[in-house]
Regions:
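Active-site acidic/histidine proton-transfer and metal-coordination neighborhood
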Residues: 16-19, 57-61, 76-167, 176
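Active-site beta-loop-alpha junctions enriched in small/polar residues
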Residues: 9-13, 35-37, 70-73, 109-111, ...
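C-terminal/domain-terminus segments
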Residues: 251-277
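Acidic/histidine-rich catalytic cores of soluble enzymes
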Residues: 6, 31, 68, 125-234, ...
């Protein structure tokens, strides 16, 4: 099996940025993904000088940015709000380039399985504009998997006719929310995968993605799933990673841990688990 580089989400460490970078280097990962939507690491607050300083600090620890997270928590489902969200996303793409990565990941909302759904066209128009911009600067705006099945997402992407909008494959989201097979998703989305999350989880019953991803108003969202440490959920990581190898993916497996009382230990355990599968 290919020896995939391993990354970690800066925010998963739950400490300040520089401490997280230092800890990631100590754990022995090679890459970092960082949220850059609000706060000190947003485009408006990270000046050119600060971007240079941050990149130098990352490099001084032997690391690179695998991707930037540009999830604005709203998707691109509202025609009135989309122009502002698209412009903010373009600035995050610019920031990512300054940090020497060409991947920005995000959630775009739930892609309807029915192409005649009003939301489908709204999302497609937004993604078409983002794909053109990403193409123009040699980058990818990568949709995170989970809200819909991989087959529905593939059909949506095929219609864009561009790799500017691509895929950040999160196998746990697929397994937890829709119950989609992460291994088959690799093959369905093979032409678009530019980044992946190493996350695990289990689904315990039916879920409504429209409620979970707040596409419809809901005061009592039922989540019949749970994020789990790597190897303890329903993601078949050996088969999943073998599939990534099979399609020729050579990018990062970036550890994302959104729950748990000891995130540093969980990230370290996850890195060891992935290395064990790869025989490192």
């Amino acid at each position: 099996m290919y020896k995939f580089p391993i990354g970690a989400m800066v925010d998963s460490f739950r400490m300040d940025t520089k401490s997280a970078i230092k800890k990631a280097a100590e754990i022995g990962v090679q890459g970092l993904q960082m949220y850059s939507t609000t706060g000190e690491n947003s485009p408006e607050n990270l000046t050119v000088e600060k971007r240079r300083e941050l990149l130098d600090y990352v490099k001084s620890h032997g690391l690179v940015f695998s991707a930037i997270c540009g999830d604005l928590n709203m998707g691109f489902v509202n025609r009135e709000l989309n122009p502002e969200l698209i412009e903010k996303s373009k600035r995050i793409l610019d920031l990512a380039k300054d940090l020497e990565t060409n991947v920005v990941t995000t959630h775009i909302g739930v892609v309807p399985s029915n192409k005649n759904h009003e939301r489908y066209k709204i999302m497609q128009e937004a993604c078409f504009e983002l794909s053109r911009y990403a193409d123009s600067i040699g980058s990818h705006f990568a949709i995170e998997t989970g809200p819909e099945t991989s087959a529905v997402l593939k059909e949506f992407l095929d219609a864009l006719g561009s790799k500017g909008v691509a895929v950040n494959l999160d196998p746990a989201n697929l397994a937890m929310v829709t119950g989609d097979d992460p291994v088959q998703a690799v093959y369905n989305l093979k032409d678009y995968i530019v980044h992946t999350h190493a996350k695990d989880g289990s689904k315990f019953g039916d879920n409504n993605p429209e409620e979970i991803y707040r596409m419809v108003p809901c005061d009592n969202i039922i989540r019949n799933y749970k994020e789990m440490p790597l190897g303890e959920g329903q993601v078949p990581f050996k088969e999943y990673m073998a599939a990534l190898d099979d399609i020729g993916y050579r990018g990062f497996l970036t550890i994302e841990r959104e729950v748990g009382d000891n995130p540093v230990a969980d990230i370290e355990t996850a890195a060891k688990y992935l290395k064990g599968i790869m025989g490192i």
